[in-house]
């Protein structure tokens, strides 16, 4: 699938700003396509620029120049690559690997908002709620190894979420509470200093 088809067959607008975003494509016109396609990349290690390097922009179509990717550091890129599973021939991220991405997004958006950046509070809340929606799908025996960096991010998320209100009932989650769910995450990811 090329950029022209992605633009034609998927929505490319950012919900909060209304601007086109060319790293996430949602709401396909055809039910044969996945609900969402996101483009990820890692920081290329083969491009090393000198401090005094001069970059020259290439003249290309305006919309094509907007094609972008969510840039991941090496630890998250490895989790993305190693955590894939195939569903109907489409690579998707496994449940236990998706949760740390949602937790990291929550941490990053929350920090950006605290630093005065324009961040939609609904997006922050969505990522927090997504963590709990996904957590209800894991079992007490589910385990996922994490790199030290991602494990630290998960610990930070779990520590900060302790002070947050999470309305499990409105998320359709019953028969448990936030404390039990966070304990399950500590277990799942082998985060030893469980409070």
Which residues does each predicted region cover?
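Compositionally biased terminal segments of proteins
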Residues: 1-195
């Amino acid at each position: 699938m090329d950029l022209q088809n992605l633009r034609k067959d998927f929505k490319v607008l950012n919900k909060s700003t209304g601007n086109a975003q060319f790293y996430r494509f949602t709401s396909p016109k055809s039910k044969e396509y996945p609900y969402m396609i996101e483009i990820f990349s890692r920081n290329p290690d083969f491009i090393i620029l000198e401090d005094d390097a001069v970059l020259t922009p290439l003249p290309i179509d305006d919309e094509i120049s907007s094609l972008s990717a969510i840039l991941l550091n090496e630890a998250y890129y490895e989790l993305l690559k190693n955590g894939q599973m195939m569903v109907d021939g489409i690579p998707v991220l496994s449940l236990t690997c998706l949760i740390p991405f949602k937790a990291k997004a929550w941490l990053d958006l929350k920090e950006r908002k605290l630093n005065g950046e324009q961040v939609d509070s609904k997006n922050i809340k969505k990522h927090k709620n997504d963590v709990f929606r996904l957590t209800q799908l894991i079992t007490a025996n589910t385990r996922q190894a994490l790199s030290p960096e991602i494990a630290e991010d998960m610990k930070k998320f779990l520590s900060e979420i302790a002070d947050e209100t999470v309305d499990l009932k409105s998320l359709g989650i019953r028969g448990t509470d936030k404390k039990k769910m966070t304990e399950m995450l500590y277990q799942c990811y082998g985060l030893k200093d469980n409070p």
